[in-house]
Regions:
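Short acidic-hydrophobic catalytic motif
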Residues: 1-301
């Protein structure tokens, strides 16, 4: 199979989830074997940051990469959309530190890439393969991620938050061609009890209640709801059927597990090339995902 890039430039604008910065990202076509690179055009010299796991510097609520002190925050949704669009080579201009969150999914980025057109290049695509089954386990959080050798790619992700409103659930991606329909629309999520802590630690400066699903686990007083509404510059918020805040409805019954699968696809793109194998993950997260990627690199054929 040939490598692919986009046919023409395409841009998206919006607000970064964690930094709160408004900005624009622009995807540009790139030559064969270029890979995925970010360019910070708001900084003198327009420094480039390569989307590779050795450049990961932070995994707090998202994956941040950096080179020579230049950071790009929350790259996982962009990387997942590129994998979903089957794009190998692209240069991504950013005029701020963090790409726009859009609705918390990869849907709009994938749509933008497809609107630009996907074209084959005059170079063969190289797929990575593991020699044997690779297992990552994090005993403290109970996370396990496994990849077994195979001639195709598929992924299964399970989550369990010991929650009454977000039940244990599993998502399966049988083939990457299903990503656009089954995974890309699935949004990030958070528990109501985490909101104030995240705001206090400056982790969701650009968040509003349209960029994430908010699950309400415990009984919440009216005063707490009003305080959160004020934090997000809203007149009021409420709890609706299924323990979800602000009248959001799920795209899929297992949307949280599907979003965790989306995140893992994006973090695994930090391998630098697509990989063949069957991946099975229980309770994945950005720290575990990126450590798993490093372990894979140690076990490549």
């Amino acid at each position: 199979m040939k490598q692919k890039t986009i046919k023409q430039d395409v841009s998206l604008s919006g607000t970064g989830l964690h930094t709160g910065q408004k900005g624009t990202l622009t995807f540009h076509p790139a030559e064969a074997n270029h890979g995925i690179k970010f360019r910070r055009i708001d900084i003198e010299g327009c420094p480039v940051v390569e989307a590779k796991v050795e450049n990961v510097v932070d995994t707090s609520r998202g994956t941040t990469i950096a080179q020579n002190g230049v950071r790009v925050y929350t790259v996982e949704h962009i990387l997942a959309s590129l994998r979903g669009a089957d794009v190998d080579n692209v240069l991504i201009d950013l005029d701020c530190e963090e790409p726009p969150i859009q609705d918390g999914s990869a849907r709009y980025m994938l749509e933008a890439l497809k609107s630009a057109g996907i074209v084959e290049q005059d170079a063969e695509r190289e797929y990575l393969r593991v020699k044997n089954t690779v297992t990552y386990f994090h005993p403290k959080i109970g996370c396990e991620i496994i990849i077994t050798p195979a001639d195709d790619f598929r992924m299964e992700v399970s989550v369990d938050y010991k929650s009454q409103v977000l039940k244990p659930q599993t998502a399966v991606l049988k083939r990457m061609s299903d990503f656009e329909r089954e995974i890309a629309p699935c949004r990030t999520f958070v528990f109501f009890q985490e909101l104030e802590m995240l705001l206090k630690h400056n982790l969701i400066k650009g968040g509003d209640l349209s960029t994430a699903i908010v699950f309400v686990e415990d009984a919440v007083q009216a005063g707490e709801l009003q305080r959160v509404a004020k934090l997000f510059n809203m007149e009021s918020v409420g709890i609706h059927q299924g323990g979800i805040l602000n009248n959001t409805t799920l795209h899929f019954e297992n949307e949280p597990a599907r979003h965790k699968l989306l995140d893992l696809i994006g973090d695994m793109a930090l391998l630098g090339k697509p990989i063949l194998g069957h991946v099975k993950a229980f309770k994945p997260g950005h720290l575990a995902n990126t450590e798993f990627v490093k372990l894979i690199i140690e076990n490549l054929e």
